[in-house]
């Protein structure tokens, strides 16, 4: 189930299906409010897809990116913390980060668990996690999101 919910197409399809259901029911019941709600849901599917788009890259290049001064962000589709982070980043900031999907890359999931074990004393796969040359941290609060945004702005001239 988590693989279906985690696919990038899942929520847009769900919004469109819900929107169509509302529009059909609204048409049959002659309820303008339901038709409008259906249009809003269907429209949200389009904006959602654009707002949460990141380009996932292979884990094999992550180490070189970090050694070059870049930022690697481990993420998984469907994660509300990841979605909030992605929507708060600008398109340029999203492009500067090296995004690695831990559901598509089992080696990345294992590596992430090792990072957390070294820092926290127990392995886990909390995402989104930012990995830099000298540190790593879970990006789940306003303060850590601001910290990541500042880091990405500082690296604006560097390798993306």
Where are the predicted features?
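Non-catalytic, surface beta->alpha helical segment in thiol-disulfide oxidoreductase systems
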Residues: 131-160
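N-terminal targeting signals for export/organelle localization
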Residues: 1-59
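Thiol-based oxidoreductase modules, predominantly thioredoxin-like and allied folds used
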Residues: 95-111
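Generic recognition of short, well-ordered alpha-helical segments
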Residues: 84-87, 110, 143
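Structural micro-motif
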Residues: 115-133
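Short amphipathic alpha-helix with an adjacent loop that forms part of the alpha/beta core around
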Residues: 109-121, 149-152
